[in-house]
């Protein structure tokens, strides 16, 4: 019977164990929080880059010439990128396959470079969207 109460005495003397657990577990929880924030920012920026490339391609493919298509693509992609998180650099480009005429394809590419929260390193996300040119005018 006396041995049984000795084990309870051991449990009562564990007053400092919570602070030790806190010291060892808190950095792990902090790491998980920072990792989650980094993953969220990467996925959110990827979604915004895809939305911007979609808007750029959608408005570019209905323009009658390449110059107007580039202007409209930049205008609407930048409008979509206003909703993105803080970024260091953005690049919007149109790649035409086979000249600006009806039936050919245009690819809108958007890349965003932004800092990660945990490490501070720059991370680049690139998305593209390809569409058929609908309103291109043939010369001649």
Q: What are these model-predicted stretches?
A:
Residues 2-3, 109-140:
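Low-complexity, S/T/G/P-rich flexible repeat/linker segments used as non-globular hinges
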Residues 13, 102, 120-122:
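Extreme N-terminus of proteins, especially the signal/transit-peptide cleavage junction
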Residues 38, 97-99, 118:
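Residues embedded in well-ordered secondary-structure elements
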Residues 55-111, 139-140:
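Short amphipathic secondary-structure patches
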Residues 2-74:
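Alpha-helical assembly-interface signal, strongest on the long, hydrophobic N-terminal helix that forms
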Residues 36, 76, 123-125:
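General N-terminal targeting signals
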Residues 6, 13, 95-96, 115, ...:
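Generic detector of intrinsically disordered, low-complexity, polar/charged segments
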């Amino acid at each position: 019977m006396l041995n049984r109460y000795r084990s309870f005495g051991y449990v009562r003397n564990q007053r400092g164990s919570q602070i030790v657990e806190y010291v060892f577990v808190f950095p792990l929880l902090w790491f998980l929080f920072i990792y989650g924030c980094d993953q969220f920012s990467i996925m959110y920026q990827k979604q915004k880059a895809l939305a911007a490339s979609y808007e750029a391609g959608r408005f570019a493919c209905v323009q009658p010439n390449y110059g107007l298509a580039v202007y409209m693509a930049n205008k609407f992609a930048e409008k979509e990128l206003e909703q993105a998180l803080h970024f260091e650099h953005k690049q919007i480009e149109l790649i035409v396959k086979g000249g600006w005429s009806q039936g050919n394809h245009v690819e809108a590419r958007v890349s965003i470079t932004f800092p990660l929260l945990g490490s501070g390193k720059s991370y680049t996300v690139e998305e593209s969207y390809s569409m058929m040119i609908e309103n291109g005018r043939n010369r001649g």
